């Protein structure tokens, strides 16, 4: 028993052992019990040998047997202690495993709580986005309704394009006219969507009869916005041509041009440029590098680069197209002038104004020399050149060109410029002078000279753009009255162009208006003519014997009247506007009929537009 060492320590009262300390003590006790058992086994073995000896000698046998029994009891107690220690160690191991599992579960709970919080945050964010989306949808629905209404107005307010006969020359291509036929409202935007309906057989390679029907169908579907039909048609035809004729056939180049047109209308400029590059390679290899069809494809490719803002890359392509056309057609051909216009637009977007002026002036000389001064291209080129002058601050040169355009449009209708027939810009400047000298009552009213543009081509966007640009130039110069006159005239010309009956009858109406004027009742009478649906100002004819018209409206009232007139115009064109129950003194403020005699009343069968309401006699 002397070798038994128990690892017990005196602990202070109330001290609570930790789990590690208990395990350590248990292991120490177990080791002590193991040592004690070994010692007892050795003693018991010694006693057994002693008993055997005593049985032979017979001395002190009982005492030895008693010691053996005590040792066996001690061995049993030691075995019991060892079993309990092993149970405690196994229990401690199990508790440690349980605690480890408990920690794992706690970690999982923490992760689940974090995920739950993240999901809550995501749900809250999704709910906020859903709320914003619903608000945006509601706003878009309102905007859609508003745009539908504006679309109804625009349907009748679109600028009509003057139809011009196009020569069936082999120098044009189906995509050759990608630049605008009419000037854009924003002079800085020179490149715009072209006219895609030009027949492809007008290009450098004539479309075979077997492809013409397909080409017409594709153009029709593209014009209707049905690209989901037009694109598969083009691709199928392209595959058939490549299979039957080979990739390098000119028919394939033509079909590539048509498919590029459809892609361009979808604003897929990269795909369209890739197709045009393929078409260019085919045409250069089959038709030669100086063929007009190659020039047309180069021009189309330059336009696509321009639409993507790659003006530097587009300029050499356009320059090469110009060189080919000059070589094939001569330097004074109208198509050369058209290419010069396109090149000028590209240079203008790069700020190369000297080159822009040179190209426009040369194109203008070609148009005037080959097509005459009254050709619409002359006015368009002058308008473009004036826009270039405006960008450089050359306001005097721009003003001169704008006045030339308006004067030429006036001469085309009336044949000359005299005191009775003055261009609108002259009236605008006279009105400005009268405004400065405070003699409104003695001036010619806007309504009397505002009808000149009706007899001209009021649907021409060139004239309309010129009116607005010159009005903006006047406003920059501080000529507010003249600017207002031109702006009102431009606005009214657009609205007048919505009524086809008015367009065909206006010259006749103006002819009747020379002698028709309402006579005054007496010295004390006053008849007031208020603006009708499309009125721009209200005027009053004072019965003081002077026979002068006085302006009595304001610009704010004008805008309100114009806004109401647009709604009435849509209802009238849709056939839903109620007809007036009786004739009254109201009518359009243009006063085109003040000069008409009472003996020549308007016929009901004339089909008046919204801007020519019935006007009864003042008697």
UniProtKB/Swiss-Prot annotation:
Residues that the record marks as modified (N-acetylserine) are: 2
TPR repeat residue numbers: 55-88, 211-244, 253-286, 295-328, 337-370, 379-412, 464-497
Which PROSITE patterns has this protein been placed in? Answer: KINESIN_LIGHT, TPR, TPR_REGION
Return the GO cellular component terms, semicolon-separated: cytoplasm; kinesin complex; microtubule
One GO BP annotation is: microtubule-based movement
Q: Does the keyword Acetylation apply?
A: yes
Q: InterPro entries from the entry?
A: Kinesin_light (IPR002151), Kinesin_light_repeat (IPR015792), TPR-like_helical_dom_sf (IPR011990), TPR_rpt (IPR019734)
> Its domain of life?
Eukaryota
Q: Which residues carry this modification: Phosphothreonine?
A: 612
Residue ranges under compositional bias (Low complexity)? 609-619
Keyword line: Acetylation, Coiled coil, Cytoplasm, Cytoskeleton, Microtubule, Motor protein, Phosphoprotein, Repeat, TPR repeat
Q: Which SUPFAM superfamilies match?
A: TPR-like
Q: Where in the cell is it found?
A: Cytoplasm, Cytoskeleton
Q: Which residues form a coiled coil?
A: 32-150
Compositional bias annotation for Basic and acidic residues: 155-175
Its function? Answer: Kinesin is a microtubule-associated force-producing protein that may play a role in organelle transport. The light chain may function in coupling of cargo to the heavy chain or in the modulation of its ATPase activity.
The entry assigns this protein to a family as follows: Belongs to the kinesin light chain family.
- Can you name this protein? Kinesin light chain 4
**Annotated organism of origin:** Homo sapiens (Human)
Which gene name belongs to this protein? KLC4
């Amino acid at each position: 028993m002397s070798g038994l060492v128990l690892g017990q320590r005196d602990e202070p009262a109330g001290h609570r052992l930790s789990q590690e300390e208990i395990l350590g003590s248990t292991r120490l006790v177990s080791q002590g019990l193991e040592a004690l058992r070994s010692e007892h086994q050795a003693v018991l073995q010694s006693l057994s040998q002693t008993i055997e000896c005593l049985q032979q000698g017979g001395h002190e046998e009982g005492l030895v047997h008693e010691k053996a029994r005590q040792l066996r009891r001690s061995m049993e107690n030691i075995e019991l202690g060892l079993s309990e220690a092993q149970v405690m160690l196994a229990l401690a191991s199990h508790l440690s495993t349980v605690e480890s599992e408990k920690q794992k579960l706690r970690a999982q709970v923490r992760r689940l709580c974090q995920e739950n919080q993240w999901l809550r945050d995501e749900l809250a964010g999704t709910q906020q986005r859903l709320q914003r989306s619903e608000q945006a949808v509601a706003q878009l629905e309102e905007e859609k309704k508003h745009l539908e209404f504006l679309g109804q107005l625009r349907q009748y307010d679109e600028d009509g394009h003057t139809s011009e006969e196009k020569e069936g020359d082999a120098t044009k291509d189906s995509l050759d006219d990608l630049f605008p036929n009419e000037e854009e409202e924003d002079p800085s935007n020179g490149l715009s969507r072209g006219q895609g309906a030009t027949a492809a057989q007008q290009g450098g390679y004539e479309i075979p009869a077997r492809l013409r029907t397909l080409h017409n169908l594709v153009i029709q579907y593209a014009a209707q916005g049905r690209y989901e039909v037009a694109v598969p048609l083009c691709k199928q035809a392209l595959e058939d041509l490549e299979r039957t004729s080979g990739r390098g056939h000119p028919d394939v180049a033509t079909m590539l041009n048509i498919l590029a047109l459809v892609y361009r209308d979808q604003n897929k400029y990269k795909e369209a440029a890739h197709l045009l590059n393929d078409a260019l390679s085919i045409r250069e290899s089959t038709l030669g590098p100086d063929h007009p069809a190659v020039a047309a494809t180069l021009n189309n490719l330059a336009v696509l680069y321009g639409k993507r803002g790659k003006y530097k890359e587009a300029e050499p392509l356009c320059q090469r197209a110009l060189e080919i056309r000059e070589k094939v057609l001569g330097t004074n051909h109208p198509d050369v002038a058209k290419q010069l216009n396109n090149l000028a637009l590209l240079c203008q977007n790069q700020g190369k104004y000297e080159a822009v002026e040179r190209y426009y002036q040369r194109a203008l000389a070609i148009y005037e020399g080959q097509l005459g001064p009254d050709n619409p291209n002359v006015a368009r080129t002058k308008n473009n050149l004036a826009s270039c002058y405006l960008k450089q601050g050359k306001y005097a040169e721009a003003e001169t060109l704008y006045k030339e355009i308006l004067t030429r449009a006036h001469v085309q209708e009336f044949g000359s410029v005299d005191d009775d027939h003055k261009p609108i810009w002259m009236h605008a400047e006279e009105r400005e002078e009268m405004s400065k000298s405070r003699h409104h009552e003695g001036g010619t009213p806007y309504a009397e000279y505002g009808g000149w543009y009706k007899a001209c081509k009021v649907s021409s966007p060139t004239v309309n753009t010129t009116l607005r640009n010159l009005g903006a130039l006047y406003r920059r110069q501080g000529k507010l009255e003249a600017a207002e006159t031109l702006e009102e005239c431009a606005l009214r010309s657009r609205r007048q162009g919505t009524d086809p009956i008015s367009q065909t009858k206006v010259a006749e109406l103006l002819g009747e208006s020379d002698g028709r004027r309402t006579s005054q009742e007496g010295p004390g009478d006053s008849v007031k003519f208020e603006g009708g649906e499309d009125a721009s100002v209200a005027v009053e004819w004072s019965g003081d014997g002077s026979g002068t018209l006085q302006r009595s409206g304001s610009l704010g009232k004008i805008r309100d009247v114009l806004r109401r007139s647009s709604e009435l115009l849509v209802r009238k064109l849709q056939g839903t506007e109620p007809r007036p129950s009786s004739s009254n003194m109201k009518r359009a403020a243009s006063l085109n009929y003040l000069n008409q005699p009472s003996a020549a009343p308007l016929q009901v069968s004339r089909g008046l537009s919204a801007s020519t309401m019935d006007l009864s006699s003042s008697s």
